[in-house]
Amino acid sequence: MGDWSFLGRLLENAQEHSTVIGKVWLTVLFIFRILVLGAAAEEVWGDEQSDFTCNTQQPGCENVCYDRAFPISHVRFWVLQIIFVSTPTLIYLGHVLHLVRMEEKRKEREEEPPKAAGPAEEHQDPAPVRDDRGKVRIAGALLRTYVFNIIFKTLFEVGFIAGQYFLYGFQLKPLYRCDRWPCPNTVDCFISRPTEKTIFILFMLAVACVSLLLNVLEIYHLGWKKLKQGMTSPFRPDTPGSRAGSAKPMGGSPLLLPPNSAPPAVTIGFPPYYAPSASSLGQASAPGYPEPPLPAALPGTPGTPGTPGTLGGGGGNQGLRAPAQNCANREAEPQTSARKASPPASTPPAAPAGGPQQFLPGGAAGSSGDSDGEGAVTAVELHAPPEPPADPGRSSKASKSSGGRARAADLAI
């Protein structure tokens, strides 16, 4: 048989870039297959055809019976098995050498001085092929090549074991009966050293089973651990690093905000509000301007606690309601003398209050209520004193009822 040194050197280079189980597999291939096949098996099967004899004198009968008994020699069958099983490993070795050569070329280009002319080409440097210890790291495309290498080796092992069983079986019998043409009848043929050949057949079958078991273990070790680790690498799209790299500060949509940022503050300005003067009594407030805030309700008033009262009506009806309110205040004046005044409301005019609010012109305090004793709500607003009316008697009474202090007696009419 030919020289195995060339194939041995190639497989030795591949052993440097394999896992621990892969190195054990290559050791089994070297010692228990190539070495045993080259040293002993060829000597055992050397007289295979010359010592195959049949009890007939018919020319050609012995040759056709040998061809039917052994379609292919065991030695040549095992040589083909070694070549086919080693081919995926050689392909993986070629991939490794290609990556190493590409890295060497890249380093040579980096060492060269940069060209003065031409725009600078932006390219992403690939990950280094070798790790810190100088070994080729099995990751990425190289990892996939290694996994396919193991899978094809396993398939070839299974195929050759099944082929050997269907071609010869796993045992050689000393007697082989042949009735193939041109034999005149069924003839008996005898095989030389059948027991020794059977031992070698079983030995090579055991080595093939060990190699198959190592391939399965390597698939478990590499396919379920390293391949899973490669699939969950930190460069996947849903990791924080990839999202941070893809998000640009000025490239996003202007309508989208970062997840942790506060909503933008929107400032809406209104013109300053001025208290209505005496000359503007009876005029409707301009649309679009905010209404003046209403002071809080007195704490002692019956009704809903804490809710500021409102006097119905729009801003345009303030002048029409002022005389009616003054009359109500004059009628309630006899009842107010027997009661004590409640504490004044200290809410400034600018204090905010919810809901629509209405005010009496001229800064008068207004009260509204039903005649059957229901509680009324009093609103107080502090403004500059209005001009004195024509009747001084009535104005003095009105000034008493519309003073800065609101009394509890004003609530009952």
Swiss-Prot record:
Per the record, ranges on the Cytoplasmic side are 16-19, 93-149, 220-413
Which cysteines bridge via disulfide bonds? 54-189, 61-183, 65-178
Which residues lie within the region annotated Disordered? 108-131, 233-258, 281-413
GO MF annotation list: gap junction hemi-channel activity
Q: Report the transmembrane regions from the record.
A: 20-40, 72-92, 150-170, 199-219
Which keywords accompany this UniProt record? Answer: Cell junction, Cell membrane, Disulfide bond, Gap junction, Membrane, Phosphoprotein, Transmembrane, Transmembrane helix
> What PTMs does it carry?
Phosphorylated on multiple threonine and serine residues. Phosphorylation may have a role in assembling connexins into connexons and gap junctional plaques, as well as channel gating.
Q: Which stretches are intramembrane?
A: 2-15
Q: Which residues lie on this side of the membrane: Extracellular?
A: 41-71, 171-198
Q: Which domain of life is it from?
A: Eukaryota
One Pfam assignment: Connexin
Q: Where in the cell is it found?
A: Cell membrane; Cell junction, Gap junction
Entry membrane topology: Multi-pass membrane protein
The primary site where this protein sits is membrane
What's an example GO BP annotation here?
Answer: visual perception
| Biased composition range(s): Low complexity | 352-376, 393-406
Question: By its UniProt entry, which InterPro entries does this protein fall under?
Answer: Connexin (IPR000500), Connexin46 (IPR002262), Connexin_C (IPR034634), Connexin_CCC (IPR019570), Connexin_CS (IPR017990), Connexin_N (IPR013092), Connexin_N_sf (IPR038359)
What tissue specificity does the UniProt entry give?
Detected in eye lens (at protein level). Only detected in the lens. Not detected in heart, kidney, liver, or lung.
| Residue stretches of biased makeup (Gly residues) | 309-318
Gene Ontology CC terms: connexin complex; plasma membrane
Which protein family is it in?
Belongs to the connexin family. Alpha-type (group II) subfamily.
Quote the function comment for this protein: Structural component of lens fiber gap junctions. Gap junctions are dodecameric channels that connect the cytoplasm of adjoining cells. They are formed by the docking of two hexameric hemichannels, one from each cell membrane. Small molecules and ions diffuse from one cell to a neighboring cell via the central pore.
Subunit and interaction comment: A hemichannel or connexon is composed of a hexamer of connexins. A functional gap junction is formed by the apposition of two hemichannels. Forms heteromeric channels with GJA8.
Q: What is this protein called?
A: Gap junction alpha-3 protein
UniProt lineage: Eukaryota, Metazoa, Chordata, Craniata, Vertebrata
